[in-house]
């Protein structure tokens, strides 16, 4: 028997919010191209998602589920991927900061983006306690996952017991391939969503 109260816990309210923001940002990037037309604002996107939820969410799951499976296959489990992801986001922040200040010698492009993220020099890493706080994964589990990642030569530990990315290693090549593959799938997802909103019979 289904408990109706449980439905409230299944509502993807935060995901709809984040997805709407993401689609809006991509819409702004494409605005100005003759073939794209007007950009779409966040509230417009949210209304569309909620009105045609089953259509949009089916398309989202076709993106999200294979995405998670690819990372699980690479990292053995999703918790390890999340731990690694916190370190990667820290590097991504430093790369963005340096790029904004025009301190990057080689232009950051679609094809060299992941390599640039791993190679960027960071002043500080991120420690196990911070990763546990951010991810809500128990600290003992985080430490165990970090040890595996260090052993796999994907990350390294500095003298302050903080973790940073490494730019070499067989596993990094696999992660880089996943990154490129993911970008193609994201592009296909966005193409379908924009097509739904601009060219289909689905109207708000």
Where are these regions (language model features)?
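Short, Lys/Arg-enriched N-terminal segment that forms or immediately precedes the first helix
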Residues: 61-72, 95-100
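Short secondary-structure capping micro-motifs at structural edges
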Residues: 67-72, 116-118, 134
């Amino acid at each position: 028997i289904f408990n109706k109260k449980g439905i409230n816990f299944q509502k993807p309210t935060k995901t709809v919010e984040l997805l709407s923001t993401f689609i809006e940002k991509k819409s702004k990037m494409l605005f100005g191209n003759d073939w794209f037309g007007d950009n779409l604002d966040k509230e417009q996107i949210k209304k569309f998602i909620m009105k045609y939820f089953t259509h949009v969410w089916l398309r989202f799951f076709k993106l999200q589920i294979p995405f998670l499976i690819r990372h699980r296959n690479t990292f053995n489990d999703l918790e390890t991927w999340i731990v690694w992801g916190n370190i990667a986001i820290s590097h991504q922040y430093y790369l963005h900061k340096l790029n904004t200040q025009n301190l990057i010698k080689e232009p950051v492009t679609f094809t060299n983006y992941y390599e640039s993220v791993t190679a960027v020099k960071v002043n500080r890493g991120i420690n196990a306690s911070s990763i546990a706080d951010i991810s809500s994964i128990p600290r003992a589990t985080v430490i165990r996952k970090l040890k595996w990642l260090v052993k796999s030569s994907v990350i390294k530990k500095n003298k302050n017991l903080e973790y940073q990315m490494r730019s070499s290693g067989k596993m990094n090549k696999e992660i880089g391939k996943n990154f490129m593959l993911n970008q193609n799938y994201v592009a296909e997802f966005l193409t379908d969503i924009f097509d739904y909103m601009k060219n289909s019979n689905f109207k708000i």
